[in-house]
């Protein structure tokens, strides 16, 4: 009999991926995946950029490049981070990855030994939890409120818990809740981090997708001790098919990520990096992101309005100012994993909330995505989901 490593017992198939297999059927209204709207992909511009790369530098594009990644693209990312996030950095402090998911995988492998503690928000991104589980950590969940992680609880844990090796957070439009940390909470967080000197993984795939309110500084922009590792991605602002993300960190930490990348992947895709770089040179990425924001902002508001009309008043849900997701909390006696089968009978798919808690011990929540469905399907799907919820209410 084949014997697998113990860590494989900790890794399960992604509930989201399994749902997407069902939700991809054309008759299903899917609020399950975190997928961008495909009609917004700039196919003609991407083709023009790809043609230019192959015409000008085809043999270079098809060859290996450095582990750090294509130099011109890293320069463009550094400039954008300065302009958008107030993060003062340069190309030397950026490592390209195959999506920010690879950056998450590297993070736990760089910092965590079996049994070490990873502090997370409760709930937290399911994909990060799955990536971290391969390193066999102990998760410590910090409660959240409408403004994100509760700092008093974080400090209590740091003061009393040994072997905390890293803290994982999404301060902007968090997955799954859509919540955003206000400026005072960010400042308090960095004050605590500087006191305890624990590495922080700041995952920011949605930061540019703000539909209302003011942009807030990244934690990395407040980092005076080199403790924050910033993860970015082109998946939400250009196209996930490129599988291009990046890590931004100070020298000592980034060197370890670089070693990990050399061992695990060698590099991100040369041709993909060159095409994205050429796209940024040839076209206005800010203009494209503005188009995305306009579309998703409208769909977010439409979902909010439809939930207000279709859901029972006992149901609570978040009111995101950006990102891709809303978080729905039902009465505790409703198991949303059981209810998901009922919703699928109505041709509606969502992600049950239990997967966003490492112990899977919260059963009454739902994550809804609003970026991928057109208006009429949002209205129809949320209305049908409201009927399913009502049928489960006491």
Which role fits each region the language model picked out?
Residues 7-99, 106, 281-282, 349, ...:
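N-terminal small-domain helix-loop-helix segment of the aminotransferase-like
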Residues 60-197, 201, 207-225, 296, ...:
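Conserved core of the PLP fold type I
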Residues 72, 256-259, 290-302, 380, ...:
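A non-catalytic, amphipathic alpha-helix used as a structural packing/dimerization or gating element
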Residues 224-294:
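Conserved core segment of the aminotransferase class I/II
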Residues 277, 294-304, 316-329, 339:
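Conserved glycine-rich beta-strand-loop-beta hairpin in the small C-terminal domain of fold type I
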Residues 334-339, 376-380:
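Short, conserved charged micro-motifs
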Residues 345, 360-394:
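PLP-dependent enzyme catalytic core of the Aspartate aminotransferase-like
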């Amino acid at each position: 009999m084949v014997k697998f490593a113990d860590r494989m017992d900790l890794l399960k198939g992604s509930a989201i991926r399994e749902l997407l297999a069902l939700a991809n059927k054309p008759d299903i209204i899917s609020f399950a995946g975190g997928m961008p709207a495909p009609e917004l992909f700039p196919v003609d511009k991407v083709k023009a950029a790809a043609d230019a790369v192959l015409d000008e530098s085809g043999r270079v594009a098809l060859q290996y490049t450095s582990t750090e990644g294509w130099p011109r693209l890293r320069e463009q990312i550094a400039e954008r981070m300065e302009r958008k996030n107030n993060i003062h950095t340069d190309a030397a402090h950026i490592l390209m990855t195959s999506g920010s998911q690879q950056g998450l995988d590297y993070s736990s492998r760089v910092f965590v030994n079996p049994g070490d503690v990873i502090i997370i928000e409760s709930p937290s991104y399911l994909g990060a939890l799955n990536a971290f589980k391969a390193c066999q950590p102990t998760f410590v969940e910090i409660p959240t409120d409408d403004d994100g992680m509760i700092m008093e609880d974080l400090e209590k844990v740091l003061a009393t818990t040994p072997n905390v090796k890293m803290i994982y957070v999404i301060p902007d439009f968090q997955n799954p809740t859509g919540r955003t940390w206000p400026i005072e909470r960010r400042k308090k967080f960095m004050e605590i981090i500087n006191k305890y000197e624990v590495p922080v993984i700041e995952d920011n795939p949605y930061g540019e997708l703000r539909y209302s309110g003011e942009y807030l500084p990244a934690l990395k922009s407040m980092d005076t001790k080199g403790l924050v590792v910033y993860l970015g991605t082109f998946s939400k602002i250009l196209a996930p098919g490129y599988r291009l993300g990046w890590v931004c960190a100070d020298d000592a930490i980034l060197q370890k990520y670089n070693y990990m990348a050399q061992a695990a992947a060698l590099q991100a895709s040369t041709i993909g990096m060159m095409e994205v770089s050429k796209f940024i040179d040839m076209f206005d990425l800010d203009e494209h992101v503005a188009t995305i924001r306009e579309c998703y902002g409208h769909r977010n508001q439409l979902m909010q309005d439809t939930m207000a009309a279709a859901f029972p008043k006992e149901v609570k849900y978040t009111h995101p100012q950006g990102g891709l997701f809303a978080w729905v909390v039902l009465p505790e006696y409703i198991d949303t994993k059981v209810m998901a089968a009922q919703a699928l009978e109505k041709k509606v798919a969502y992600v049950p909330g239990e997967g966003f808690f490492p112990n899977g011990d919260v059963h009454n929540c739902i994550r809804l995505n609003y970026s991928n469905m057109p208006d009429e399907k949002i209205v129809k799907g949320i209305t049908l989901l409201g009927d399913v919820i009502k049928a489960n209410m006491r």
